[in-house]
Structures are given as structure tokens and as C-alpha cells.
């Protein structure tokens, strides 16, 4: 069984779907905020977020989402890759 793709196996414009998916919960976001000492009320205070955003509720920390996406890509890139040199767009 091969884990990951080599550089030559990636194609420009290809879409790679990663399993398993992840449903982000309020608990996940709050835990990430606490672990990273991000205490901005936009992420933790529902009353503040309801008044300060167009969403009407807390906003998930962008770094958390990026970390999840990067983690989901590990099976495709980490097994054969020597280094991850660049992430151009997500």
C-alpha cells in the first residue's frame, strides 16, 4: 500500500477529495481559542458576535480551518513528499 503521492502524480487543476470529513462544532472552535489564547469575543461571545457580525453568531477562527485543511491533506502529500514548499490557494 502506497501512502501519499509523488510530485509527478499530481496534476494541475486536479481536485483531490480527502476523507474523513470534519464537522466543526462550537466546542471545537472554543477549544482551539483556549489552546491558542485567542480571546477575541468574535469567537467566544455569542452576544458580541450577534451584534458585531452579519452572521449573527460566533465566527470560527480562520487558523483552525486552515489547520484542518492542511491536516486533511496529509494522506496525499506527506507519505511521498520530501517537503511541502507552498500552498497557493485553498
Protein language model regions, located:
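Hot-dog-fold acyl-thioester-processing enzymes
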Residues: 1-89
Amino acid at each position: 500500500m502506497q501512502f501519499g503521492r509523488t510530485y509527478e502524480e499530481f496534476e494541475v487543476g486536479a481536485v483531490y477529495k480527502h476523507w474523513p470529513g470534519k464537522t466543526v462544532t462550537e466546542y471545537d472552535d472554543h477549544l482551539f481559542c483556549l489552546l491558542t489564547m485567542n480571546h477575541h469575543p468574535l469567537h467566544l461571545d455569542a452576544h458580541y458576535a450577534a451584534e458585531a457580525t452579519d452572521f449573527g453568531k460566533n465566527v470560527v477562527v480562520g487558523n483552525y480551518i486552515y489547520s484542518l485543511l492542511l491536516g486533511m491533506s496529509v494522506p496525499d502529500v506527506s507519505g511521498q513528499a520530501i517537503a511541502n514548499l507552498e500552498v497557493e490557494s485553498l
